[in-house]
Amino acid sequence: MNNPAYSLTMRDRLAELAPYVGNTPLYPIKKLFPSQKVKLFAKVEWQQFGGSVKARPAYRILRKAVENGSLDGGKAILDATSGNTGIAYAIFCAVAGIPLTLCIPENASKERKHILRSLGAKLEFTSPFEGTDGAQERARELALNKPHLYHYTDQYSNDNNWLAHYHTTAPEIWEQTGGKITHFVAGLGTTGTFTGTGSRLIEYNSGIELIALQPESAMHGLEGWKHLETARTPAIFNASLPDRVELVDSSASYEIIRDAAKYEGLFLSPSAAANLLGAIKVAEKLDEGTVVTVFADNADKYGDVMQEIFSNN
């Protein structure tokens, strides 16, 4: 029998968090890209409850699951993650009292593992060599074998992933640029940020160019990103949406982390740095325009990587 009081309590608790998700600042990049006619901005996505860009889809996915009764009977949320979506899930689930199980590659940073455990998430570790594809396989196995215990949200094929960006990220960018955005640049992981934001932006102005970024090779070290030629393409990805796809060098992305800290006061994660590098390359080819990218998270969860990068300074 369903427990309406249990579901209503979760619904109310999640609803209280709505003002704290999204509405992130749009930061102007001026020292690393000084230009009078071409403006470069980035959405600083770690400045919201949930700690990263993944707060947006995680929040929408959870709210819809509660509203649809998918968690009735005390089912746990189950999903695969490289870390950021998992952390956002864990934060929201802790507030709402929702049990959470996450399948995550074993090579996820120790900071992410510590945060997830501290927030009460149960972790299922998968092969580091299979990345998030392996984590998805394990999540599917658990959902298939124990359907009475889990609601598998599957962020890689869940339309609420990209819809979160369609309804929040894109309108924020449009308003913050005064409708002047000419190019949107973002890396591909679950592809939700690119798909949702890009789809809405071209509804505002069909002339906006959408440039997708991906790493140059399968062994790239950009946590959360996918090399689509060698990885499973997320079901939510609209391959016809990008005007073009640009490749980003991982080593150069790591190098720009130092410059972003020194000249812009930004402590960027590797994937945020890769977005910055890709956006600069796009902006450098323009005579005029407004380029916007997304800084998914900062470097707080990448201690070992940052120590290696900054130890030579």
Language-model region placement:
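PLP-dependent amino-acid enzyme catalytic core
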Residues: 1-313
